[in-house]
């Protein structure tokens, strides 16, 4: 839940790793409900893309898209194509959520097609003599099992996979793609009582509304400071936006050296830490008596070591890092 809140507040991409039946898909489906309402400009742009893909429905106006293509989808289905070119799933998720379940089961060209839009928010389609560019600013949520049988690390069921099989399975996802993902969440096996009738849903609606208010307050804080969510900060602006304390800088420098992180990964950790700090700021702000939301007058403090420490834990276990 905490990582989902951070992802929503900062527009960060999210990788969920865990055995089957642990609720990875349910978590992904909750994300759109935590995101801020679409602005008129966002709704217009998303509707225009959907119209080009012949997938516009008036009843969905203003609702953030949630696209969940099957793992058998081709690179063309994800990216788009045709004559004339039409947007694929990547663009149809513009201003919304793209959920890729069973991530290693997608073919390699399809996965590699994600790299451009994750960096730029746009996708270029070149087919024969035609070339088209579509917006593709989506929030990626990906899910995978930890191994081919799905039970590596499952205390309730033994894993049948050899180390070599696990390495091959995880190796289907390239290092450059993994490096572009922000948050890793290991989703553990839950006891059956967790999913008993009424146990999950009793306070879930109220809890979601509370988290959504914090997310919106943190987004407003970031927007007022830099005109964009934290995940969309360019590398040159990341450190100044973080405004880190000396303790935060020292902690991240030590972690980066020990874990061999690249400059791209460092920037991602600073962005995550900035979001953690924003959530901490709005969490301590006095609530508006009318709405219950955090007031917009809360100051934006620096990123401290405690914020960096939380951000590090979402990166240190990424496959290949």
Whereabouts are the PLM-identified features?
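N-terminal pre-P-loop "Q-motif" helix
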Residues: 1-3
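Conserved alpha-helical scaffold flanking the Walker A/P-loop in AAA+ ATPase domains
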Residues: 5, 59-65, 70-98, 130-131
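Pre-Walker A (Motif I) flank of P-loop NTPase domains
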Residues: 10-15, 94-96
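Basic, amphipathic alpha-helical bundle interface domains used for macromolecular binding and assembly
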Residues: 85, 108-321
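Walker B catalytic acidic pair
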Residues: 95, 101-102, 113
């Amino acid at each position: 839940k905490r990582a989902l809140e951070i992802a929503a507040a900062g527009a960060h991409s999210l990788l969920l790793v865990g055995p089957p039946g642990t609720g990875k898909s349910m978590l992904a489906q909750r994300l759109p409900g935590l995101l801020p309402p679409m602005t008129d400009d966002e709704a217009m742009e998303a509707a225009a893309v959907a119209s080009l893909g012949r997938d516009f429905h008036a009843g969905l106006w203003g609702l953030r898209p949630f696209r969940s293509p099957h793992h058998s989808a081709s690179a063309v289905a994800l990216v788009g194509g045709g004559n004339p070119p039409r947007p694929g799933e990547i663009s149809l998720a513009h201003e919304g959520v793209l959920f890729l379940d069973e991530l290693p089961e997608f073919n390699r060209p399809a996965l590699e097609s994600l790299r451009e839009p994750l960096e730029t928010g746009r996708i270029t389609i070149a087919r024969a003599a035609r070339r088209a560019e579509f917006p593709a600013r989506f929030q990626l949520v990906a899910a995978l099992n930890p191994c081919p049988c799905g039970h590596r690390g499952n205390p309730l069921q033994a894993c049948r996979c050899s180390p070599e099989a696990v390495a091959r399975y995880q190796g289907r996802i390239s290092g450059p793609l993994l490096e572009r993902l922000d948050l890793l969440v290991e989703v553990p096996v839950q006891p059956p009582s967790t999913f008993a009738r009424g146990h999950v849903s009793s306070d879930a609606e109220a809890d979601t509304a509370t988290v959504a208010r914090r997310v919106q307050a943190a987004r407003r804080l970031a927007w007022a400071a830099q005109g964009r969510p934290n995940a969309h900060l360019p590398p040159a602006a990341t450190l100044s936006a973080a405004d880190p304390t000396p303790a935060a800088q020292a902690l991240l420098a030590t972690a980066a050296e020990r874990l061999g992180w690249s400059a791209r990964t460092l920037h991602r950790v600073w962005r995550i830490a900035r979001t953690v700090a924003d959530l901490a700021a709005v969490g301590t702000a006095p609530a508006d008596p009318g709405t219950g939301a955090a007031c917009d007058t809360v100051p934006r403090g620096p990123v401290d070591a405690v914020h960096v420490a939380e951000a590090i834990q979402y990166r240190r276990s990424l496959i290949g890092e």
